[in-house]
């Protein structure tokens, strides 16, 4: 008994010490810098020119990066806390107010994991690349670090630099390895994304220099600033344009079908799985979190734009005869649910938007990978030129069917849960009038009805449509290879897992989403003249007026120190 009484406190102390070390370890900086450093080592890898050695090296770097992000989640992240965790802060250029500040909360941590996971699979999907393989894998690894940085940095000026970092690799991946119109698609991509990102820089400078003195661009500082309503509205409008291009929001979407139409399978996976999520994440992080009063007034517009995305993109996808462009417009349609969820003032609806980003990242990556695999066999993207290949590619047909069912939100798949959460969250959101909720829900349901029609008809045309004799007779239609089955299986495991037990993912961000919604609810109640047609009038209470800003939640390290 004496031995037990002595050893128990020692074990507890050792456990706390271990937790403290894990929380203070620079997990996020390592996950950002490791793939970037690995990218710069690629030119020194001995290779015979076909990329056989380079691709193994790149796969190893991508897998280690994924394991680093998993370790960060397991050993340094506490899902029950809503505040910033895994914090690292180094004063970089103090005169300019630029700080290397990284951290993660429930809004960013799931997307960091998604980024490293999709990138590792994209490297495996790039196995057949033999044209300039060193440059190709260099760009993929550089994108890995840059995209993780977008979700992890906690300084707005540093965020802008990370946002710009991933533009050049995508441009080169499109311009060098794309299809016949690759130069047009790459140029259009860089004009849209680089041009719109200037708004991020302008808003960052305006918010950082707000109030005079030494500029400070850190999120924690900006969240405590008392920005005027007019200032918030201007900043919100600029950021909505910048992030709306990346999401993308109609009519700022036209670069995406062109980019997808010319990209290769691994680039497809990065575009659909990660790049679009950067726009949704940024809307949550900046527009909803840092500019709550402006968000309360812009929220109805986000919901209307979300419905436009859903219906317009679904109808356009229905009319597309090019397989890549059909799936591209389908992606735009599904991202409309993210806008509706972000515009919702309910925790369920906003949580659904977060889950929809994760779900669509997985489903979109799987569909576009299958598009690339199918093109490698048929050498055509026109649906009327396909048909009758189902008998020779039965495994491929099975993979296509499962992924298409996930995209059309079949119960038991992640897409069903996320869209249902958005629908129910918005329908029960009493911040909006009943008429507005009924109209929006009814219109959004049109997209839900159209999705299975164009996806299932697409499958019928590809595999069981009118046979193309030249394709069936003279083309070596090889069925799915083990590598391809493995990639799709890796994506289907979380898709089905989240669909059957959503708490596998929702528990990781619920606390942060609830804090975000609470902040926006308080901002909504401070608005004096809400729109009578869309937003219900709210009564201002003394408790709300006396608390203009929410307190910063203690970090993981502070909690451990208190223990």
UniProtKB/Swiss-Prot annotation:
It is a multi-pass membrane protein. It comes from the Bacteria. It is found in: Cellular thylakoid membrane. Disulfide bonds: none annotated. GO terms for cellular component: plasma membrane-derived thylakoid membrane. One of its GO terms (molecular function) is NADH dehydrogenase (ubiquinone) activity. It is an enzyme of class 7 (translocase). Its main location: membrane. The keyword Nucleotidyltransferase does not apply. The keyword Ligase does not apply. The chain crosses the membrane at residues 25-45, 56-76, 90-110, 111-131, 133-153, 157-177, 189-209, 230-250, 264-284, 298-318, 335-355, 356-376, 397-417, 438-458, 485-505. GO terms for biological process: ATP synthesis coupled electron transport; electron transport coupled proton transport. Keywords: Membrane, NAD, NADP, Plastoquinone, Quinone, Thylakoid, Translocase, Transmembrane, Transmembrane helix. It catalyses: a plastoquinone + NADH + (n+1) H(+)(in) = a plastoquinol + NAD(+) + n H(+)(out); a plastoquinone + NADPH + (n+1) H(+)(in) = a plastoquinol + NADP(+) + n H(+)(out). Its EC number is 7.1.1.-. InterPro entries: NADH_Q_OxRdtase_chain4, NADH_Q_OxRdtase_chainM/4, NADH_UbQ_OxRdtase, ND/Mrp_TM. Belongs to the complex I subunit 4 family. NDH-1 shuttles electrons from NAD(P)H, via FMN and iron-sulfur (Fe-S) centers, to quinones in the respiratory chain. The immediate electron acceptor for the enzyme in this species is believed to be plastoquinone. Couples the redox reaction to proton translocation (for every two electrons transferred, four hydrogen ions are translocated across the cytoplasmic membrane), and thus conserves the redox energy in a proton gradient. This is NAD(P)H-quinone oxidoreductase chain 4. It comes from Prochlorococcus marinus (strain MIT 9313).
């Amino acid at each position: 008994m004496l031995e037990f009484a002595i050893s128990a406190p020692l074990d507890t102390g050792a456990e706390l010490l271990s937790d403290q070390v894990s929380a203070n370890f620079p997990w996020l900086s390592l996950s950002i810098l490791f793939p970037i450093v690995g990218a710069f080592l690629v030119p020194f890898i001995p290779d015979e020119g076909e990329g056989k050695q380079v691709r193994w090296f790149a796969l190893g770097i991508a897998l280690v990066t994924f394991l680093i992000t998993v370790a960060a989640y397991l050993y340094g992240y506490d899902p029950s806390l809503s505040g910033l965790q895994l914090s690292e802060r180094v004063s970089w250029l103090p005169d300019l107010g630029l700080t290397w500040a990284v951290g993660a909360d429930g809004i960013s941590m799931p997307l960091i994991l998604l980024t490293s996971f999709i990138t590792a699979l994209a490297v495996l999907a790039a196995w057949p690349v033999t044209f300039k393989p060193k440059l190709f894998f260099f760009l993929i690894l550089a994108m890995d670090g840059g995209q993780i940085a977008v979700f992890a940095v906690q300084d707005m000026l540093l965020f802008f630099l990370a946002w710009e970092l991933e533009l050049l690799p995508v441009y080169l991946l499109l311009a060098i390895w794309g299809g016949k119109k690759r130069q047009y698609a790459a140029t259009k991509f860089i004009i849209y994304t680089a041009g719109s990102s200037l708004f991020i820089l302008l808003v960052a400078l305006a918010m950082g220099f707000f109030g005079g003195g030494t500029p400070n661009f850190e999120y924690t500082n900006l969240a405590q600033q008392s920005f005027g309503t007019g200032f918030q509205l201007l900043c919100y409008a600029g950021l909505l344009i910048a992030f709306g291009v990346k999401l993308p929001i109609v009519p700022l979407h036209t670069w995406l079908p062109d980019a997808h139409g010319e990209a290769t399978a691994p680039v497809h996976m990065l575009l659909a799985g990660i790049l679009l999520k950067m726009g949704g994440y940024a809307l949550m992080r900046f527009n909803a979190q840092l500019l709550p009063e402006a968000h309360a007034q812009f929220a109805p517009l986000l919901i209307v734009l979300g419905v436009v995305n859903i219906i317009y993109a679904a109808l356009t996808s229905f009319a597309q005869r090019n397989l890549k462009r059909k799936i591209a417009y389908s992606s735009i349609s599904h991202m409309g649910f993210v806008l509706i969820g972000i515009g919702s003032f309910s925790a369920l609806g906003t949580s659904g938007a977060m889950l929809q980003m994760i779900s669509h990242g997985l489903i979109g990556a799987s569909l576009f990978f299958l598009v690339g695999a199918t093109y490698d066999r048929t050498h055509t993207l026109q649906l009327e030129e396909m048909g009758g290949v189902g008998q020779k590619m039965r495994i491929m047909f099975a993979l296509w069917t499962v992924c298409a069912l996930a995209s059309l939100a079949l119960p038991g798949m992640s897409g069903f849960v996320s869209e249902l959460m958005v629908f129910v969250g918005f329908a029960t959101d009493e911040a909006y009038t009943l008429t507005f909720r009924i109209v929006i829900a009814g219109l959004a349901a049109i997209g839900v009805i159209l999705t299975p029609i164009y996806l299932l008809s697409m499958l019928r045309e590809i595999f069981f449509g009118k046979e193309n004799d030249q394709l069936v007779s003279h083309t070596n239609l090889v069925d799915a290879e083990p590598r391809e089955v493995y990639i799709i299986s890796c994506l289907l495991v979380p898709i089905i897992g989240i669909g059957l037990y959503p708490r596998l993912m929702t528990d990781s961000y619920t606390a942060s989403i609830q804090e975000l919604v609470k902040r926006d609810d308080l901002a909504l109640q401070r608005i004096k003249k809400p729109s009578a047609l869309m937003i219900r009038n709210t009564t201002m209470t003394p408790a709300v007026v006396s608390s203009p800003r929410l307190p910063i939640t203690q970090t993981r390290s502070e909690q451990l120190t208190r223990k």
